[in-house]
Amino acid sequence: MKGIIRAGMAALAAVALLGGGAARADKPLTLGVSVGLGNVAMEIAVREARAQGLDVKLVEFSDYISQNEGVNDGSLDANYYQHLPYLESMIAAKGYKLVPVALGYTSRMAIYSKKHRALAELPDGAAIAYPNDPVNTGHALLILQEAGLITLKPDVGTKATLRDVTANPRKLRFRELEGSIVARALDDVDAAVIYPGFVAVAGVKPESALYAEKDSSRYAIRWVTR
């Protein structure tokens, strides 16, 4: 956590200099974050920043869209919740004038369950939930393949969709949900592919994953401003 706090303070300073906060020194720097366990470290970083003279206000969101909208329209100075592939996809889709200014923590997307303690316990026909945005859909399907549950077309990468599934020997049933509600669906599905910070809010221990991706370096969370 200390590393996150130090990185957070450095990034807050960078956002203040490079982002909208530099132009409105009489107002607090407004930072959009997603509701989740990781905000504990962010709240500490904000307190430390305030002690050093930088006024920061955290604004929590429960969805994936509003934070980028807020930074783009100027109601937020920055946000801290997304990895680079997701940011790039939103810029392409929405035309946002957003830029990543600092690297945050790396969070491994993983398979979680409230009903089963191991992948081997998943029954045939198990219901699996994951985020429905294109980038995280592809990411989730790659993790399901890495875990040995499905097979995808060769070299499909993060653009994978259900149409790219070539083998599903356990006849898994897939539920594509808005990203912020996937964790809450854990009571209704056999497992979900989601980030640790979101499952913590749903009362699941982040370390209890049935399977976590092996390499998550490309999916480090970024500080984003305009």
Regions found by a protein language model. Give the residues of each.
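Immediate post-signal peptide segment of exported/extracytoplasmic ligand-binding proteins
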Residues: 21-30, 49-54, 119-125
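Beta->alpha turn/N-cap motifs
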Residues: 36, 60-64, 74-88, 105, ...
